[in-house]
């Protein structure tokens, strides 16, 4: 939760963990109270124009979270309407990848670009947002950009969405860990990864830094699949750039080179060398807060109290 002014300055912020609230109505109640409290402490509630929210599987067109797999509540949640009715202000809800792209365009690596793609690699999976001619492309139902659920391996790993071979099962944090476990199970080759108490993208990367061949193979395979996915995306959309963001961007030093190699191998020849592959320069939390503030300005002002 944050207060952001018209210049994009983050005035105040605090954290609320959705996992602490298994009952949706309890979360909405606490969230509403915190929004009012942080506003009153920083200029007054009457100074707030609107609220922007970043959420997984959110549909900007309906203001709902729809069948998200990585939050405690299931089904369709009309979050914008629920919150608006409690706090009496305009509320806009956007898909987390869409919010990330808004933050990148306004304040980050995509500043000044008209056509670009933001790909978020994180703990929950892989999301993306397409900007075309200066505007986000949401699709008919608001689901455009689900790169993580594009099938990249026929008959591959089962995905939480119910299908097999989705990209996020190979390049998200859980996908990287699965690759490491598969490689260790398939070979008796010694590896520092076998001695790790906890396998994570970062601990695997640290093994890479120590020259561990199997750990390096994990990220070579990750980059190979990510490069194919990005090449298909670039061939379809012909953007100025593809920007990688999310929790896994800090691991990019281990997978960026094989990603670029695979991208150049698989992208359409006429645009090879013309699409930049970039890693976001913004802090993840700051970027998403700023992106949500940009979204808040797009919704028509509404208030029960002004």
Describe each PLM feature range.
Residues 1-4, 62-64:
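Short, conserved acidic/polar surface loops in the N-terminal third of protein domains
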Residues 2-48, 85-87, 109, 154-158, ...:
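ATP-binding/phosphotransfer module of carbohydrate and carboxylate kinases, centering on a glycine-rich
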Residues 50-177, 291-306:
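Phosphate-binding/catalytic loop of phosphoryl-transfer enzymes
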